[in-house]
């Protein structure tokens, strides 16, 4: 069967036909590294990591590029606030990104280029755009792309130039020939890092970096460009326009965009101040709950984030993990089951769901069904049937989506009991010191980990809560 994806440029679901048979070349916009990543940042990373896994399962060789924007106004501002070099900020948060990515089981792309490693190539690209008449310099050393010179501007986002001119989003800049024009090169300002160029010292604009890095690593035209829908305009529109002006060729054949994370009615964003960091989410809800949350809705739809919703995902993830744990305790060295019509049929349904515009909600529903069947098979002593379902959940479906593949144990072993008892000793010390706020925080943290405590006249009692089936 063919794979179909929704192409943002056409607004239609299209069959994936790659430039080179059996190979998918894919670029995913990565983070600007000035802070820790939040759940909103994690959605494209998780979604397109899973999509890449699925493509590999279907036999494609995937060449994936995800960039790091390591020079930007936000990075410079952060460096000035800390009193350090901008490279220290970028290096710090690239390292922190990898910690968060690892905590979610996100695999590295084939290439992770950094903007500052491609400045010479960016300067060359800007020079070519100037020579072709698509860009111009201004008196302070800035270089701008002339939007009206590129007739197809607005094709990706569906925006018309006349509407943009009157729109509130257009920045007023008297140096530009037209208010819609965007920066390819920014002239140096006092205290900012800079690089030499024919127009004087400065640094790359945001959009040109992705054009240059993607085309250098994947070619002038590649298969898929992906990212969050908030990047469609202006970032991806500008990127597409300057790339096609530069080469005279189509840029990306397909554009995939994930929906936003919504919290308290707004897009999750550092600028709004409504973010929830990935590391906080993994600590509070667990890796599989976070990934379940990000994959249980179709990738193109927005997702509402709240503690209540996350706790529901945590409960759902724990149901599956508890079932898998039960199987692994009974069969510590599970073998590979013999393929039969049932396994082939279920796997085909799973694959068909993902072939249809990467319908992860439908695919995940099959995992939950298998988990229930696995429990039933163990209850009835049907070992072979249990093994088939365990194999599909962990080694096939879980491997494709990056779910339930970590072998998490949630049993009440001797070590678990000792840890809880030690935590309760610390809590008791806080209670003796009348630091009830700290004691309550420990109580709440234990409850979030499904450990219920009760203070009685005979001391503190505790129990591990059963996860409802």
Swiss-Prot record:
Family matches, as SMART domains: DALR_2
Cofactors required: Zn(2+)
Motif segment ('HIGH' region): 31-41
UniProt keyword annotations, A-Z: Aminoacyl-tRNA synthetase, ATP-binding, Cytoplasm, Ligase, Metal-binding, Nucleotide-binding, Protein biosynthesis, Zinc
Major localization class: cytoplasm
UniProt keyword annotation of Cytoplasm present: yes
InterPro entries: Cys-tRNA-ligase (IPR015803), Cys-tRNA-synt_Ia_DALR (IPR015273), Cys-tRNA/MSH_ligase (IPR024909), Rossmann-like_a/b/a_fold (IPR014729), tRNA-synt_1_cat_dom (IPR032678), tRNAsynth_Ia_anticodon-bd (IPR009080)
Free-text remark on how the cofactor is bound: Binds 1 zinc ion per subunit.
Residues annotated as binding Zn(2+): 29, 210, 235, 239
Gene Ontology biological process terms, A to Z: cysteinyl-tRNA aminoacylation
Localization of this protein: Cytoplasm
Family: Belongs to the class-I aminoacyl-tRNA synthetase family.
Record's protein name: Cysteine--tRNA ligase
Organism: Thermosipho africanus (strain TCF52B)
The encoding gene: cysS
């Amino acid at each position: 069967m063919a794979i179909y994806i929704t192409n943002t440029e056409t607004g239609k679901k299209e069959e994936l036909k790659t430039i080179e048979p059996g190979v998918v070349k894919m670029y995913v916009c990565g983070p600007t590294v000035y802070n820790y990543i939040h759940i909103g940042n994690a959605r494209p990373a998780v979604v397109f990591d899973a999509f890449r896994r699925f493509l590999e399962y279907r036999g494609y060789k995937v060449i994936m590029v995800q960039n790091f924007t390591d020079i930007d106004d936000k990075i410079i501002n952060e460096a000035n606030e800390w009193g350090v070099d901008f490279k220290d900020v970028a290096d710090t948060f690239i390292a922190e990104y990898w910690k968060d990515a690892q905590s979610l089981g996100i695999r590295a792309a084939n290439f992770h280029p950094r903007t500052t490693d491609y400045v010479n190539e960016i300067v060359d690209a800007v020079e070519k755009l100037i020579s072709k008449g698509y860009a111009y310099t201004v008196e302070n050393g800035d270089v701008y792309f002339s939007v009206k010179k590129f007739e197809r501007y607005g094709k990706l986002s569906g925006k018309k130039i006349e509407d943009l001119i009157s729109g509130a989003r257009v920045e007023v800049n008297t140096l530009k020939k037209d208010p819609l024009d965007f920066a390819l090169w920014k002239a140096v300002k006092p205290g900012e890092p800079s690089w030499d160029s024919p127009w004087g010292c400065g640094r790359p604009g945001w959009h040109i970096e992705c054009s240059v890095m993607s085309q250098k690593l994947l070619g002038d035209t590649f298969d898929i460009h992906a990212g969050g829908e908030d990047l469609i305009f202006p970032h991806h529109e500008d990127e597409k326009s300057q790339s096609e002006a530069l080469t005279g060729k189509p840029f990306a054949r397909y554009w995939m965009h994930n929906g936003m994370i919504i919290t308290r009615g707004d897009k999750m964003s550092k600028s709004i101040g409504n973010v929830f960091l990935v590391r906080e989410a993994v600590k509070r809800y667990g890796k599989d709950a976070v990934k379940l949350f990000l994959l249980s809705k179709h990738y193109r739809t927005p997702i509402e984030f709240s503690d209540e919703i996350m706790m529901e995902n945590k409960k759902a993830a724990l149901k599956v993990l508890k079932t898998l744990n039960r199987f692994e305790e009974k069969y510590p060295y599970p073998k590979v089951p013999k393929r039969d019509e049932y396994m082939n049929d279920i796997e085909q349904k799973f694959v068909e769901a993902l072939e249809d515009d990467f319908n992860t909600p439908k695919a995940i529903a099959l995992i939950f069904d298998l988990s229930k069947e696995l429990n039933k098979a163990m209850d009835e002593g049907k070992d072979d049937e249990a093994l088939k379902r365990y194999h599909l959940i962990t080694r096939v479906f879980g491997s494709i989506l990056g779910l339930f593949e970590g072998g998490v144990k949630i049993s009440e072993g001797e070590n678990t009991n000792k840890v809880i008892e030690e935590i309760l000793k610390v809590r008791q010390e806080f209670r003796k010191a009348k630091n009830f706020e700290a004691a309550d925080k420990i109580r709440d943290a234990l409850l979030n980990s499904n450990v219920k405590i009760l203070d009685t006249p005979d001391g503190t009692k505790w129990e591990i809560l059963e996860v409802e089936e």
